[in-house]
A protein has these predicted regions:
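Active-site gating loops and adjacent loop-to-helix segments of metal-dependent hydrolytic enzymes
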Residues: 119-148, 207-224, 259-272, 328-357, ...
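Acidic, glycine-enriched loop/beta-strand segments at the rims
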Residues: 43-47, 62-75, 88-89, 401-406, ...
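Histidine-rich, glycine-flanked metal-binding segment
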Residues: 40-42, 47-53, 62, 67-107, ...
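His/Asp/Glu-enriched, well-ordered alpha-helical/loop segment
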Residues: 287, 356-441
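Metal-associated gating/positioning segment near the N- to mid-region
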Residues: 104-185, 189-191, 207, 308
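Histidine/acidic-residue-rich catalytic or RNA/ligand-binding cores of hydrolases
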Residues: 121-124, 180, 209-211, 261-263, ...
């Protein structure tokens, strides 16, 4: 499998980063508007943060996700890329740069635990689609080329960062092979600006009637959704080892793929992998030190995921009682993406009389009522990156308190991705990843759609606080 094409694109971007500027994207009319993001779509490479650099942030209000409450008149002291002190009595060191957010609400940087940076249309106009036609799956990889999609990935990742998502998890490249591995490495090495990233590669799917495998230029099998095809316990183990070799953090599998709605309104989800195959994937991934996320809408495919012990089942559009019981027994979370499903609501209702979006609302509320852990995951890609902050309002609309909605993208998500000792709270020793809004998000959750300040690792990404 090829992955060097992604690095070629990254290298080209270094010289373009400081001169490329285009209008900010505008949210689809179907969604609430978000605060205007910076004009430059490609941010300049990050300045090297000196270990001796000292910053003091005066926070008029600070959300503490550990307690779900607002603290007042806090001082956050930052040295280099880490927080060294925080509290009402924290001393501001002599010579420190002081950032005045005394009229704002400061929070930990946000975490989106499920999105796709190689998907999505950064050129979206008002009311336009999130996806550029032909940019996803194997067709997209062939039509546009991996280099072009790497450019899309960088722009999308930077829009996520500018919107406040200082940490993201990319769960499948949809035909982009290992481009996200290269992007993650380029960000970590300081070549380009971007959020902290954990990434999956092309994903793995079993042969089934919903996908027809065909070769790319390098003759590696790939499904029509842009995933690697593997079958049988030995075959899936080999696929996991191969993806581990290329440097992924996660293995993404499709436990269901084809779905439809019956005339009586029930949802039918066809499983792909058997339980034995799913167990082999999980066993091999964990042996390689990788986490596993499974795409599963419901039924047998979702049951197999949970029973096999994947780290994060995703979607759960048609969540039955058996799945709820299994999730609780296994103490597993469920990432319920929302906005990605909303994009096709109208056409699905026209075709079937119902939709995944409508099923998702019921299933989300069911999982929440049962006490299943629900990290923030947007599925960004089918809709424009950087606009998923609007999902906070839906979390509240669907039953979460504002504090719970915020926690889902902070402490909850940090725990799920295994970075709870690095991000997710404003604490001594953690990365200096901060966001701020003008108002009180506990009183008005739509404040999250108006992020005004973003800091990642002690470096200010944007500051629009008046």
């Amino acid at each position: 499998m090829r992955r060097r094409d992604g690095l070629t694109a990254i290298a080209a971007l270094i010289s373009l980063a400081t001169i490329l500027a285009v209008p900010a994207i505008v949210r689809s009319q179907a969604q609430p508007a978000v605060a205007a993001l910076p004009q430059a779509w490609v941010l300049p490479p990050p300045a090297q943060v000196s270990p001796a650099q000292t910053i003091a942030v005066r926070a008029g209000r600070m959300f503490d996700p550990r307690t779900g409450t607002l603290l007042t008149n806090q001082v956050i002291v930052i040295r280099g890329d880490r927080i060294t002190d925080v509290g009402p009595n924290a001393q501001i060191p002599a010579g420190a740069r002081v950032i005045d957010l005394s009229r704002a609400t400061v929070m930990p940087g946000l975490i989106d635990s499920h999105l796709h940076v190689m998907d999505g249309n950064p050129l979206t106009a008002p009311g336009g689609p999130g996806i550029i036609p032909g940019t996803t799956g194997a067709a997209g990889a062939n039509t546009l080329g991996l280099q072009y999609r790497e450019l899309i990935a960088l722009v999308n990742a930077q829009r996520d960062l500018s919107a406040g998502f200082t940490t993201i998890v990319d769960l499948m490249t949809h035909g982009g092979w290992y481009g996200t591995v290269d992007l993650r490495n380029a960000i970590n090495n300081g070549l380009v600006q971007g959020p902290r990233m954990q990434v999956a590669g092309p994903g793995i799917v079993a042969t089934n009637k919903a996908n027809i495998a065909f070769p790319l230029i390098n003759e590696s099998p790939i499904a029509n959704l842009g995933a690697q095809v593997a079958n049988g316990p030995d075959g899936v183990r080999a696929a996991v080892r191969e993806q581990a070799h290329y440097g992924v953090d996660w293995i993404k599998i499709y436990s269901t793929q084809e779905f439809h709605f019956e005339p009586n309104g029930t949802m039918v989800n066809t499983p792909t992998f058997t339980l034995e195959e799913t167990q082999a994937i999980v066993s091999e991934a964990h042996r390689q030190g990788l986490k596993v996320a499974c795409h599963a809408y419901g039924g047998e495919g979702l049951h197999n995921c949970i029973q096999a012990g994947v780290d994060v089942p995703t979607h759960g559009v048609d969540l039955d009682d058996a799945s709820v019981k299994l999730l609780l027994e296994k103490k597993l979370p469920l990432t319920s993406t929302m906005f990605d499903l909303s994009m096709e609501d109208a056409q699905e209702v026209k075709r079937w009389g119902t939709s995944r979006w409508r099923f998702m609302e019921k299933s989300f509320k069911k999982a929440s009522a049962a006490g299943i852990v629900q990290p923030f995951g947007s599925g960004a890609g089918p809709f424009p990156h950087g606009t998923q902050v609007d999902q906070f309002a839906y979390l509240v609309k669907w039953g979460k308190t504002p504090a719970q909605a915020l926690q889902s993208a902070m402490t909850v998500a940090a725990q799920i991705i295994g970075w709870q000792d690095q991000v997710g709270t404003v604490e001594k020793g953690k990365f200096a990843d901060l966001v701020a809004v003008a108002g009180d998000p506990l009183a008005d959750i739509t404040e999250m759609s108006r992020i005004l300040f973003v800091m990642k690792g002690g470096q200010i990404v944007r500051n629009d606080v008046k």
